[in-house]
Structure formats: structure tokens, C-alpha cells
């Protein structure tokens, strides 16, 4: 384990760096799609502070199920086809560390926020607007 502390989902921001260390519960999983040689699927994940869309690749699509608690190291939060997703990326790692027992919220969804470059620091992003309070891909059950 590296020395960095875990980041709550509400504190993640878009970045080209793979440095996100966090833990969340998988709430829902979309259809598996094939992009060239790669199999992908989108999931809705959350912790006690926020929710986000999480991109699973290849064998990860079959390895994780709703209810799994997942630990992510060296993750990246960036755009994939105009959609902001959290993912492990090439250097990241995800592993199941438990199941079912984790407090979570479904709002805000960090993937449903429009981000803009920080006028004071072009390497950082700031919230510009909320596109939707809930996931538009995984609507709330209520």
C-alpha cells in the first residue's frame, strides 16, 4: 500500500494523472459492450459522500457484481467518449475487499457535473454546473 490516504468520491476532480485512491460499493452495472478487442461495461458506484460512473474493462466486467465493495488504487477520473468516468486505467488496480456493508449516497453524481478549467490554474478543474443530480444512465429506483 502506498502512503496516500483515501479520497472521498466527492473530492475527485478530472485529471490526466492516475493518482486516485478510494473505496466504494458497486450499485449497478450496465450492459457489456465490445470496443475493438476490448470488452467494457459502465457501473454506478458510490461511497458515503457521492456517486460516480465507473468504467470496467475486459475481465473486470465479469469479476465484479452489485454489492461488491471495491478498493481502487492509482485510478483516473477523465473523459471517455464525452462522458466523465472513474477507472483504473493502465497503471491502476481494483480489488474486491468486501460486500454489502457500506454506507453510500447516490447524489451528487460526480459524472453528472460539468467541469471547467480553473481560471487561476489551467492544470486544475472546478465545478461549472450540475448537469443532473442523479445518474442519467442509472436512474434512481424510487
Give the ranges of each region predicted by the language model.
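Hydrophobic residues positioned within well-ordered beta-strands of beta-sheet architectures
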Residues: 22, 43, 72-73
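Short interface patches used for recognition in eukaryotic signaling and trafficking proteins
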Residues: 6-8, 51-58
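Short, charged beta-turn/beta-strand-edge "cap" motif at the junction between a beta-strand
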Residues: 75-81
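Short coil/turn segments at secondary-structure boundaries
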Residues: 36-39, 56-59, 85, 89
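OB-fold nucleic-acid-binding modules
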Residues: 1-34, 81-142
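OB-fold (S1/OB) nucleic-acid-binding surfaces
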Residues: 27-54
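Short nucleic-acid-contacting surface segments enriched for D/E, G, S/T with interspersed K/R
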Residues: 58-74
Amino acid at each position: 500500500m502506498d502512503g496516500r490516504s483515501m479520497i472521498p468520491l466527492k473530492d475527485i476532480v478530472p485529471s490526466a494523472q492516475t493518482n486516485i485512491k478510494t473505496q466504494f460499493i458497486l450499485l449497478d452495472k450496465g450492459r457489456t459492450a465490445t470496443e475493438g478487442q476490448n470488452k467494457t461495461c459502465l457501473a454506478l458506484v458510490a461511497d458515503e459522500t457521492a456517486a460516480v460512473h465507473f468504467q470496467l474493462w475486459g475481465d473486470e466486467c465479469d469479476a465484479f457484481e452489485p454489492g461488491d465493495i471495491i478498493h481502487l488504487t492509482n485510478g483516473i477520473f477523465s473523459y471517455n467518449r464525452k462522458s466523465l468516468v472513474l477507472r483504473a486505467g493502465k497503471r491502476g488496480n481494483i480489488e474486491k475487499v468486501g460486500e454489502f456493508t457500506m454506507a453510500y449516497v447516490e447524489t451528487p453524481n460526480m459524472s453528472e457535473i460539468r467541469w471547467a478549467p480553473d481560471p487561476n490554474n489551467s492544470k486544475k478543474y472546478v465545478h461549472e454546473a450540475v448537469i443532473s443530480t442523479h445518474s442519467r444512465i442509472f436512474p434512481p429506483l424510487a
